[in-house]
Swiss-Prot record:
One of its GO terms (cellular component) is host cell nucleus. The keyword Protease applies. Residues 251-263 have a biased composition (Basic and acidic residues). SUPFAM superfamilies: Herpes virus serine proteinase, assemblin. The active site is at H53 (charge relay system), S123 (charge relay system), H142 (charge relay system). GO terms for biological process: nuclear capsid assembly; proteolysis; viral release from host cell. It comes from Infectious laryngotracheitis virus (strain Thorne V882). This is Capsid scaffolding protein. Region of interaction between pPR and pAP is called Amino conserved domain (ACD). The region of interaction with major capsid protein is called carboxyl conserved domain (CCD). Keywords: Host cytoplasm, Host nucleus, Hydrolase, Phosphoprotein, Protease, Serine protease, Viral capsid assembly, Viral release from host cell.
Length: 586
């Protein structure tokens, strides 16, 4: 298979740094424009390209790195010696092309598909700078092909030619593209590895696949970074809307499946599509890419058009838009009101006197049947009448309008009888009646059913009988029982009212205590007033002498400091009380 890859290397292009989107990478990976300019220019072939920053797995080299307004742009080449290693792990019938649709893929294109989706990002490795250090020409270490780099906007675009890789970036100006084309043409003799170690490549790829299994939002990240890099029409990267390849689903080889395989195109629906269970067994899809894209959008063919665009009767709409259109259509149907019939229909209704057979006795859904007079201007009392419209073989059963219905009556209501005795019969549009929509009637009926069920349930609970255990609705649970077996019931907090109720003290005892306290307070105030004229210094001396005498008589232990402190506290309180009494007396 490697002999069919008729080129020596593949071009790869992409941004290594997007200056305006470096917040998520962290300060350690932040690279300013001044630092990039200090490390430029780079000589072709001096910076290697490897896989997942593995120095032992070099697969290409960098041709040039340019400082552009959006960020640091890289152009390099990758050896096609990777092609036989990649394609050896793909079954022969997995990659296919529909010749009838004009999709013929070469081995180079198949390799580009695999490379674009297995290693879709670029990652720059640079030397760690000291504080206030200016980068030199050895600042850039290598460029890695990886799953997702730390820096945002670093999407790798591969191509068999330089124009195919560079042309995917819409923000590049014409002079910049011409400069890159010139470098690619001049440096196309850059040395790339002609032979690669299969065990080393296999080890690195296995390591990458294991790490990539934990990237749940890989497709979303790729699409976001693709927009940051101004890549809107990639050719091979399948985390997008335009693809040119499908991976065939394994099924039994039967003539029916073979026909389906030839007729069904490469489009696929998202994983949440409501029509997923109705897909044919032989439908081609991209299961390996569905988990990566997670985009919920339909895939298209190589030229960007629909697979069945030649029929000009198919329009591809995103699933979210299709669901919103269905919801809006349902709301419009529910909000419609009956319209008045035309005069021709009223005339045909009045002139028709035939009787419908029981099998054709239909009635619009959602409307209540009248008990006596069922239709407008029937030929007689309690007569089942249907207008001539219902005898039309093309009639599909939808009631065109709601006729005027008079209340129940015992008089015949034939139009001739009514006009000869009471004048002209009123037309169908004379008395417009506002009928509720089907949606409103459904909601009202559901509410009525719910209320009836609740009332029935309450009635059943009120009629509960201990003698009939089958009517027992629920087990009686005490407040002290645990909810789960083995669960400890927490002790309930007892309120003040419950404490008073438990003590059962008479109310009079509390009032007596309050009165006793008031009398005691009055006595203390009177004593303080009489003692306010005494000398505070002599009083203090007496207290100190008494305390010294008491302390001398007692033994020295740990309680003596406490007693001295209590005496000082009492003296302080007396002084405050005396001052308060003096203030009240003044």
């Amino acid at each position: 298979m490697s002999e069919n890859v008729d080129i020596k290397y593949i071009f790869v292009a992409g941004y290594l740094v997007v200056y305006d989107h470096q917040e998520s990478a962290g300060r350690e990976y932040e690279l300013t424009r001044e630092q990039s300019k200090s490390a430029l220019p780079v000589l072709p072939g001096t910076i290697p390209i490897n896989i997942d920053h593995e120095s032992s797995c070099v697969v290409g080299t960098v041709l040039t790195i340019l400082d552009l307004p959006r960020g640091l742009f890289c152009l390099g080449v990758v050896s096609t010696a990777l092609a036989p290693i990649f394609l050896s792990y793909v079954q022969d019938d997995a990659l296919f092309a529909n010749a009838e649709e004009g999709m013929v893929l070469t081995e180079t294109e198949k390799f580009l598909y695999l490379l674009s989706n297995i290693l879709p990002s670029l990652s720059l490795s640079s030397r760690r700078l000291e504080k206030n250090e200016v980068p030199g020409k050895d600042f850039f270490a290598h460029v890695a092909l990886c799953e997702l780099g730390r820096r945002e906007g670093t999407v790798a675009i591969y191509g068999a030619t330089a124009s195919e890789a560079i042309g995917a970036f819409d923000d590049l100006s014409a002079p910049i593209k011409e400069q890159l084309y010139e470098i690619a043409t001049r440096e196309k003799c850059a040395e790339v590895p002609r032979e690669l170690s299969r065990p080393e490549i296999t080890r690195v790829l296995m390591k990458k696949f294991i790490h990539g299994a934990f990237l749940m939002d890989r497709g979303t990240c790729l699409k976001t970074r693709r927009e940051m890099a101004a890549v809107y029409n990639p050719k091979y990267l399948q985390a997008n809307e335009v693809i040119t390849i499908g991976i065939k689903e394994h099924s039994e080889e039967t003539p029916e499946n073979a026909i389906k395989d030839r007729s069904v195109s490469t489009q696929t629906a998202p994983s949440f599509d409501i029509s997923e269970s109705q897909q044919p067994s032989g439908q081609t899809h991209v299961p390996a890419m569905e988990s990566a894209t997670c985009s919920g959008q339909f895939l298209q063919t190589k030229n960007g058009a629909s697979p069945s665009a030649s029929r000009e009767d198919m329009v591809y709409v995103p699933f979210e838009k299709y669901a919103s259109l269905l919801a809006a259509s349902a709301r419009r149907d529910n909000d419609r009101r009956p319209v008045s019939p035309s005069r021709e229909f009223s005339r045909r209704s009045r002139d028709s006197t035939h009787e419908c057979s029981p099998g054709r006795d239909i009635w619009p859904r959602g409307f209540e049947r009248h008990p006596r007079l069922e239709s407008f201007m029937g030929p007689g009392m309690n007569h089942t009448y249907r207008p001539a419209l219902y005898e039309d073989p093309n009639f599909c059963g939808r009631f065109p309008y709601i006729p005027y219905q008079s209340p129940a009556s015992t008089y015949p209501v034939h139009p001739n009888y009514y006009s000869s005795n009471f004048g002209q019969f009123p037309g169908a549009g004379t008395y417009p009646i506002q009928y509720p929509s089907l949606h409103e009637q459904t909601v009202v009926s559901r509410l009525d059913a719910l209320i009836s069920a609740l009332e029935k349930n309450n009635k059943r609970d009120s009629e509960y009988s201990e003698n009939n255990p089958r009517k027992r609705s629920a087990r009686t649970i005490s407040e002290n029982d645990p909810y789960f077996p083995g669960e400890m019931v927490p002790a309930k907090k007892i309120t003040t009212e419950q404490q008073l109720c438990e003590k059962k003290e008479p109310v009079g005892s509390g009032i007596n205590d309050i009165l006793q306290g008031i009398l005691t307070l009055q006595k203390e105030v009177a004593g303080l007033k009489s003692a306010s004229n005494a000398d505070s210094s002599s009083e203090r001396k007496e207290e100190l002498e008494n305390s010294n005498q008491e302390s001398a008589r007692e033994t020295v232990d740990a309680s003596m400091p406490k007693r001295l402190k209590d005496a000082q506290t009492k003296l302080k309180r007396k002084k405050e009380a005396a001052a308060f009494a003096q203030m009240m007396a003044d």
